[in-house]
């Protein structure tokens, strides 16, 4: 950011903000940012931004926010909730949006100092961006196994700076062209305001249809001494195209406690075709229907230091 790379829209510390029916194109930095505001409505906003690095579509670090009916096509994260200050990003509802990205479509983080509370996201579609001049994951990270431009993660929930993610519902999402449909990461990178371990509690992800490309499975991972707690994932149809032999599977996944959170952060092919779960206390998988279109010899689930795990109605074809 700064004077050399301004955002197109930037509200900070404002009350009762409404942005509606505008088109924003090719920002120098983040396209629009709402920081420490109270009472924000963003409706019917169209974003097309593929001019620079850091071309996020919509960044929210505010309270009492409604986002609806937006079309976002950008190079960096499409919808990004941030927590850069000493107050949490909370009471946020997002619905009826089209999200296209070369990075993450729905993301909490990376900045996660205070956290994210009471958030619902529903009725959205996710797809690969229209352009890819910068990232080109298929060229720069060939081990991922993608052949085209892709979204990094459809849903990425990241708390790594001492903040908390709690009371979150994400539902009715259709996604295609993604590397990893669901990425949940509790890390221990920085502690500024809370001086305590990051936390992720009470999250529900439901009614998801996803077509993924490449070898990086979904992952839900905490760190030693920092468990993710009370996660429910239900009613998911997942179709993957990964081709992985048993000899390619690496059971020694590094902890990467303070690394930048991203689906490829472990630097290896995860030992699950569906969900790799580690350092979690309380997780339920209900009605997960997974289909592999190529020969993937990994099991659907791989668990490491997981307590109170349940699964019901989960199938792998």
In which residue ranges do the predicted regions lie?
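Extracellular/periplasmic carbohydrate-active domains that bind, remodel
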Residues: 1-317
């Amino acid at each position: 950011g700064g004077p050399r790379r301004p955002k197109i829209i930037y509200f900070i510390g404002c009350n009762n903000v409404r942005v509606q029916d505008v088109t924003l194109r090719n920002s120098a930095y983040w396209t629009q940012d709402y920081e420490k505001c109270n009472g924000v409505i963003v409706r019917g906003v169209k974003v097309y931004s593929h001019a620079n690095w850091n071309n996020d579509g919509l960044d929210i670090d505010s309270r009492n926010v409604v986002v609806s009916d937006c079309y976002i096509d950008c190079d960096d994260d499409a919808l990004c909730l941030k927590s850069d200050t000493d107050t949490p990003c909370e009471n946020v509802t997002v619905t009826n949006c089209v999200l296209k990205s070369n990075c993450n479509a729905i993301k909490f983080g990376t900045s996660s100092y205070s956290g994210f509370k009471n958030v619902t996201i529903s009725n959205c579609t996710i797809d690969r961006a229209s352009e890819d001049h910068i990232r080109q994951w298929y060229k720069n990270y060939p081990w991922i196994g993608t052949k085209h431009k892709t979204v990094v993660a459809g849903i990425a929930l990241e708390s790594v700076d001492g903040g908390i993610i709690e009371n979150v519902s994400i539902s009715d999402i259709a996604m295609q062209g993604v590397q990893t449909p669901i990425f949940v990461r509790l890390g221990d990178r920085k502690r500024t305001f809370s001086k305590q371990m990051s936390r992720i509690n009470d999250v529900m992800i439901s009614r998801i249809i996803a077509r993924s490309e490449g070898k990086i499975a979904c992952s839900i991972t905490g760190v030693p001494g920092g468990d993710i707690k009370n996660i429910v994932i239900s009613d998911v149809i997942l179709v993957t195209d990964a081709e992985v032999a048993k000899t390619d599977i690496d059971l020694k996944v590094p902890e990467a406690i303070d690394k930048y959170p991203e689906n490829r952060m472990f630097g290896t092919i995860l030992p699950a075709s569906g969900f790799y779960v580690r350092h979690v206390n309380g997780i339920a998988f209900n009605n997960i229907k997974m289909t592999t279109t190529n020969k993937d010899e990994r099991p659907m689930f791989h668990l490491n230091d997981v307590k109170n795990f349940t699964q019901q109605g989960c199938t792998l074809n």
